[in-house]
């Protein structure tokens, strides 16, 4: 049996399904390239049949990724499989992942079929996928609530049809470790052709068991773990990549000789990137990547740490690429210093625009004095979303609030190269007043669905990141803004969302024009 545990990342498929607003193709590609540097073996990047946007993002990622295998999801339906193959065909190497529900509840209530029908559908789906690639994964949806006899029967049939990976998902997070481990053990010992395929596991965290179930499955013979960065995913989320990888690495007394290809020093950086781009804050006490994961407050713990780090630290923060911040970046620092800090954090220059980053850094350094590495990361990721094609940009903003009186604001923007000013009186607070002014300038009909403010850094001069989700003509758009001033970061978030709407409207107009020709 192989000693390498295959890491199958589904952040861009299962993880993205949990987001309030979809990622752009550019944002998905950023994450995919980061996952490639992290060393994931397989990345599942979308469900191409679901939308033209998903097809485009899968195709774009497939074109750029060279060192990881790109995978797309499809139901056990010919059309799904054909479209997935079409999106993936530009890849260096690709996998088609097809699935069908197998639990009695799903087979009878959702599919309205017999289990014999389901087995035949699985066989035909795998055979069709094998027309396009020799790397086919088959999943028994809701395997956690499927009888073991039926799991073994359909797994054997799928392998005989050509599946090279068979996935046994706990789709609704129902299983406890002992019973899930037993399912994997039964499959290992009862399926006669199991040596011709890799057993994969895909666990959800509804009962908080995703990591434990995945690790127990490995102990019972599974050799692929499906997971996401930070554990993001539907409902309570998926198995967290960083947790299973570091558990295997840290507990070699149990996982003797087993390892992954993951470059663990990239974990912190990728975790932060996914958190920021997906607008999914990481809880402070989150294992491995939370801000408190390596913090020791108790006096007794601190004393032990000073004497010997191993007293309370089972792994070092450096292992996941977490470095202590240095207070040596100021407005006097040059481009080389900024680039050096980005290099030290593991970024390559094609990950960001140094000119834009340095200009944003100087503005922030003038306000803050000292700039930290986490500030640079935030500036790089947020600013690179504000593209050169933006029609709307912020020039000047002022707001005023007097006790018991409505707030007022003055906003000056540049729209299509023309400077426009607007005064707004009667806002329910300064942010509302600024938003009223911007919407008056753009004449945009927008409904605010979500507003979230997060501090990036520490102290009174910390950056404030505002993430919003707005609705326009039935579609949702995400906006993000970053500044030391909350009102300014709020304005920038709205302008970011409006630019996304402008781009979407432009695409719709082009499509309409093409159809009419």
Swiss-Prot record:
It holds the Pfam family HMGL-like. It comes from Histophilus somni (strain 2336). NCBIfam families: leuA_bact, PRK00915.1-1, PRK00915.1-3. Pathway: Amino-acid biosynthesis; L-leucine biosynthesis; L-leucine from 3-methyl-2-oxobutanoate: step 1/4. GO terms for biological process: L-leucine biosynthetic process. The gene is leuA. It catalyses: 3-methyl-2-oxobutanoate + acetyl-CoA + H2O = (2S)-2-isopropylmalate + CoA + H(+). This is 2-isopropylmalate synthase. One of its GO terms (molecular function) is acetyl-CoA C-acetyltransferase activity. Residues 393-517 are annotated as: Regulatory domain. SUPFAM superfamilies: 2-isopropylmalate synthase LeuA, allosteric (dimerisation) domain, Aldolase. It comes from the Bacteria. Its main location: cytoplasm. Homodimer. Its cofactor is Mn(2+). GO terms for cellular component: cytosol. Belongs to the alpha-IPM synthase/homocitrate synthase family. LeuA type 1 subfamily. Mn(2+) binds at residues 14, 202, 204, 238. It is found in: Cytoplasm. Keywords: Amino-acid biosynthesis, Branched-chain amino acid biosynthesis, Cytoplasm, Leucine biosynthesis, Manganese, Metal-binding, Transferase. Its EC number is 2.3.3.13. Catalyzes the condensation of the acetyl group of acetyl-CoA with 3-methyl-2-oxobutanoate (2-ketoisovalerate) to form 3-carboxy-3-hydroxy-4-methylpentanoate (2-isopropylmalate). The keyword Transferase applies.
């Amino acid at each position: 049996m192989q000693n390498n545990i295959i890491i199958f990342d589904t952040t861009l498929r299962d993880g993205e399904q949990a987001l309030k607003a979809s990622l752009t193709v550019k944002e998905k590609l950023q994450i995919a390239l980061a996952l490639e540097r992290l060393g994931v073996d397989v990345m599942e990047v979308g469900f191409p049949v679901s939308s033209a946007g998903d097809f485009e993002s899968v195709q774009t990622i497939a074109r750029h990724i060279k060192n990881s295998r790109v995978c797309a999801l499809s139901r056990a339906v010919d059309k799904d499989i054909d479209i997935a193959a079409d999106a993936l065909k530009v890849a260096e190497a690709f996998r088609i992942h097809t699935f069908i529900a197998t639990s009695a509840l799903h087979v009878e209530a959702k599919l309205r079929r017999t289990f014999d029908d389901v087995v035949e559908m699985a066989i035909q789906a795998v055979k069709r996928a094998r027309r396009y690639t020799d790397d086919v994964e088959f999943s028994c949806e809701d395997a956690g609530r499927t009888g073991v006899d039926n799991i073994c029967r359909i797994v054997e049939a799928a392998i005989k049809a050509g599946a090279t990976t068979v996935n046994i998902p706990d789709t609704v997070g129902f299983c406890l470790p002992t019973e899930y481990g037993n399912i994997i053990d039964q499959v290992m010992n009862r399926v006669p052709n199991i040596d011709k395929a890799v057993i994969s596991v895909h666990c959800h965290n509804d009962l908080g068991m995703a990591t434990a179930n995945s690790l127990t499955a490995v102990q019972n013979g599974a050799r692929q773990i499906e997971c996401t960065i930070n554990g993001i995913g539907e409902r309570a989320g998926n198995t967290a990549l960083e947790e299973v990888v570091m558990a295997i690495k840290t507990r070699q007394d149990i996982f003797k000789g087993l390892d992954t290809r993951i470059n663990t020093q990239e974990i912190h950086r990728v975790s932060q990137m996914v958190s920021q781009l997906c607008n999914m804050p990481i809880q402070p006490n989150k294992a491995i990547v939370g801000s408190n994961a390596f913090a020791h407050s108790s006096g007794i713990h601190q004393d032990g740490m000073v004497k010997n780090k191993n007293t309370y630290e089972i792994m070092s923060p450096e292992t996941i690429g977490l470095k202590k911040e240095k207070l040596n970046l100021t407005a006097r620092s040059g481009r080389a210093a900024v680039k050096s800090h980005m290099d030290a954090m593991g970024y390559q220059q094609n990950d960001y625009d140094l000119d834009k980053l340095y200009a944003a850094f100087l503005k922030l350094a003038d306000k803050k004095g000292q700039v930290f590495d986490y500030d640079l990361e935030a500036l790089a990721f947020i600013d690179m979303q504000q593209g050169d094609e933006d029609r709307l940009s912020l020039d000047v903003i002022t707001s005023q609030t007097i006790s018991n009186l409505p707030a007022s604001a003055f906003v000056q923007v540049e729209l299509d190269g023309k400077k426009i000013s607007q005064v707004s009186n009667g806002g329910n607070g300064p942010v509302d007043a600024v938003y009223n002014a911007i919407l008056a300038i753009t004449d945009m009909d927008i409904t605010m669905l979500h507003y979230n403010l997060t501090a990036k850094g520490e102290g009174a001069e910390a950056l404030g990141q505002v993430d919003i989700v707005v609705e326009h003509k039935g579609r949702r758009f995400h906006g993000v803004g970053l500044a030391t001033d909350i009102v300014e970061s709020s304005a920038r978030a709205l302008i970011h969302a409006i630019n996304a709407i402008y781009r979407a409207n432009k695409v719709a107009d082009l499509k309409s024009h093409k159809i009419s020709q």
